[in-house]
């Protein structure tokens, strides 16, 4: 329940712009969120492995 409240709180516009922060759109995780995708590293990795993110490939060198 607390996570839902924090997700709702993060969705509101803060009084001061610097207080805003990103959350994963899929799971609500507040840390390690990639702005380009709007996903945290965990969800990004899962979706990339399943091929749900177009243009994202596993790198090898």
UniProtKB/Swiss-Prot annotation:
Disulfide bonds: none
Gene Ontology cellular component annotations, sorted alphabetically: cytoplasm; small ribosomal subunit
InterPro entries listed in its UniProt record: Ribosomal_uS14, Ribosomal_uS14_bact, Ribosomal_uS14_CS, Ribosomal_uS14_sf
Protein name listed in UniProt: Small ribosomal subunit protein uS14B
Cofactors required: Zn(2+)
Signal sequence annotation: none
Keyword Ribonucleoprotein: yes
Pfam families xrefs: Ribosomal_S14 (PF00253)
Annotated family: Belongs to the universal ribosomal protein uS14 family. Zinc-binding uS14 subfamily.
GO molecular function terms listed in the Swiss-Prot or TrEMBL record: rRNA binding; structural constituent of ribosome; zinc ion binding
């Amino acid at each position: 329940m607390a996570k839902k409240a924090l997700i709702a709180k993060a969705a509101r516009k803060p009084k001061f712009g610097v207080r805003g922060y990103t959350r994963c759109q899929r799971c609500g995780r507040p840390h390690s969120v990639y702005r380009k995708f709007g996903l945290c590293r965990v969800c990004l990795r899962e979706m990339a492995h399943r091929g749900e993110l177009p243009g994202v490939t596993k790198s090898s060198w």
